[in-house]
């Protein structure tokens, strides 16, 4: 039964209840359900039953609050809301309930087969240590998507200098992993935590396998087709020297196009986490963050950063205790006091202003003018056609007070597709209006997608790697943004948050001058 048929049955039930004088509220509920089912992006018949009842301990009333009041429609969105402390703002959702939901959802997601990079990164060291203990360190090499710093990992891959026949008995233990697949030259296991482990095996072409599996299928096929007679029994550097092209680091070995680029240009020194000089886009307990502004500023300074951009939610984000005009004035006064108190460091006044349905921002120009930085983001009515999304975003980009375009598509990896946009038109508009594009470093966002950053760099649009931190610990997410930026060949000169304090202030002043709002 498809969604249309399910919707038809709900609609019929609603009409029959009206005819028989049943409770009008119940009848209307079925009519509303019919509308929503018919407009679902995925077929309900394809949704596993366990997905509907995945979160134990949440009754119908809480589900109603989550869906109707919080406007949350997927497990991933709910997890993200918990991580941002949003559930605690609603009646019946305490800290314990919120943590229970996080634990249950993470367990569920771990069994779906795909993982975010940091989830795999957390367990990879133990797996590496285990394999090295079995086969010795010189015979084990990590490879594949994880080595390329992919944002989503389906399998953790290793090259092991041994044969299938010798490896399989070594995996027999009290809790052996499940052998899912065996092929000549590879074994695929499923670990107890649900993660799939692929081992590329064999001793004859061991060193070649280390290199060829480090790239995507497209990259490797193009490399092998173009460069024959390569001696793979050497380092990666030697392999590229033999091919007479510039060295390509593993994170860039995704497409054939990078090979053509490496023939003519030297790959620049890619941005590193240590290049980040300031925290841009952070939330305090004035909205939905966990820490005070002072706590966040002192922590940022202790970590070696030169400045902090506090970008609490705007007034339309009622679910996140968005700031009214009065609260903005009070916060700005408080920031002034902190800047006098904390020396050798600066806090910048900012806001994450909601892009409304018509593309306008949710404050008057006189209020927007009081901020050092305005991050414009979409948080509501995410189910848009490309035409609607483009109209909304382009108008926000054209607003002279927009400094940074936040999380461009609104996606949540493994949970929610972003709304459809024409990336090139968005980037062109940012270039024309002197708007910086955020690379939201939260590992569940990583938005703008790194695949579109190259075009932004061609158009001289600055990228800003921002943690979207709701806690002090959230500062650490910067690293995941850097890993994504490296895949787009971003240098520190092309990233706003790499600017030192003076350079950052100068950049903000220049942008405002170009926009005519200084």
What are these regions (language model features)?
Residues 1-84, 89-91, 100-107, 241, ...:
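Long, highly charged, low-complexity intrinsically disordered interaction regions
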Residues 118, 122-135, 142, 248-252, ...:
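Amphipathic alpha-helical
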Residues 149-163, 167-284, 290-304, 315-345, ...:
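Charged catalytic cores and adjacent phosphate/nucleic-acid-binding surfaces used
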């Amino acid at each position: 039964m498809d969604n249309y048929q399910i919707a038809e049955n709900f609609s019929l039930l609603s009409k029959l209840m009206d005819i028989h004088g049943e409770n009008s509220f119940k009848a209307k509920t079925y009519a509303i359900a019919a509308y929503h089912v018919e407009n679902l992006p995925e077929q309900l018949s394809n949704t596993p039953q366990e997905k509907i009842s995945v979160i134990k301990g949440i009754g119908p009333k809480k589900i109603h609050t989550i869906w109707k009041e919080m406007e949350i429609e997927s497990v991933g969105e709910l997890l993200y809301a918990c991580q941002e402390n949003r559930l605690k703002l609603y009646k019946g959702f305490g800290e314990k309930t919120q943590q229970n939901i996080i634990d249950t959802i993470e367990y569920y997601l771990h069994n779906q087969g795909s993982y975010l990079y940091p989830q795999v990164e957390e367990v990879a060291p133990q797996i590496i240590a285990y394999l090295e203990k079995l086969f010795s360190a010189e015979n084990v090499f990590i490879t594949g998507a994880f080595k390329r710093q992919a944002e989503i990992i389906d399998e953790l891959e290793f090259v092991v200098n041994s044969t299938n026949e010798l490896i399989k008995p070594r995996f027999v233990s009290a809790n052996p992993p499940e052998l899912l697949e065996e092929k000549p030259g590879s074994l695929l296991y499923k670990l107890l935590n649900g993660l799939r482990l692929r081992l590329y095996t064999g001793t004859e072409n061991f060193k070649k396998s280390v290199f060829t599996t480090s790239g995507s299928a497209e990259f490797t096929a193009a490399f092998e087709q173009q460069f024959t007679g390569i001696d793979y029994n050497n380092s990666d550097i030697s392999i590229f020297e033999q091919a007479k092209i510039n060295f390509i680091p593993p994170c860039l070995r995704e497409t054939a196009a990078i090979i053509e680029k490496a023939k003519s240009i030297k790959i620049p020194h890619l941005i590193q986490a240590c290049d980040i000089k300031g925290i841009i886009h952070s939330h305090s307990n004035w909205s939905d963050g966990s820490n005070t502004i002072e706590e966040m500023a002192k922590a940022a300074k202790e970590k070696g950063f030169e400045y902090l951009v506090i970008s609490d939610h705007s007034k339309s984000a009622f679910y996140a205790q968005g700031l009214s005009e009065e609260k903005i004035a009070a916060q700005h006064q408080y920031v002034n006091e902190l800047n006098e108190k904390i020396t050798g460091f600066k806090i910048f006044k900012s806001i994450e202003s909601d892009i409304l349905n018509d593309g306008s921002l949710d404050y008057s120009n006189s209020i927007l003018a009081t901020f050092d930085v305005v991050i414009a983001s979409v948080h509501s009515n995410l189910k848009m056609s490309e035409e609607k999304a483009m109209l909304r975003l382009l108008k926000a980009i054209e607003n002279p007070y927009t400094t940074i375009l936040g999380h461009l598509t609104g996606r949540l990896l493994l949970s929610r597709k972003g709304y459809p946009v024409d990336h090139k038109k968005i980037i062109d508009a940012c270039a024309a209006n002197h708007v910086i594009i955020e690379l939201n470093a939260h590992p569940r966002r990583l938005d703008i997608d790194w695949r579109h950053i190259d075009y932004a760099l061609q158009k001289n649009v600055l990228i800003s790697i921002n943690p979207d931190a709701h806690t002090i610990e959230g500062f650490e997410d910067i690293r995941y943004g850097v890993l994504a930026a490296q895949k787009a060949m971003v240098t520190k000169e092309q990233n706003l948050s790499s600017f030192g304090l003076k350079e950052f202030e100068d950049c903000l002043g220049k942008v405002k001058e170009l926009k005519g709002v200084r």
